[in-house]
């Protein structure tokens, strides 16, 4: 990141509320099929980021994804069912892929997901997160469902 022109003040940058279809995992009956659907969504997100970066240019610094873009909301599943099928592990492959996208495109990438915690088995949290341009997860805000 470049130094601000005026010390103590941020330079201008572009932010994007990325509009992309959410392919919810509610039709999937198990984690394996839900994971495949999430992987396909991650590929679409990557393609959209590539296009946005080319269109907007290097001033694009912040991209915000749609709400629950990887899974959509639960549609009648119990808490344990949704936790098993759709909630992401904090160190799971979906977060690794999101971190890689932030790094590849040099943006702060913000979004939210359902997230598990090993200290609360069978439950999940609604988690909002931000990855920085180096791929580090720099912010997580969680709340109970």
Please describe what each predicted stretch is.
Residues 1-145:
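Hydrophobic structural segments
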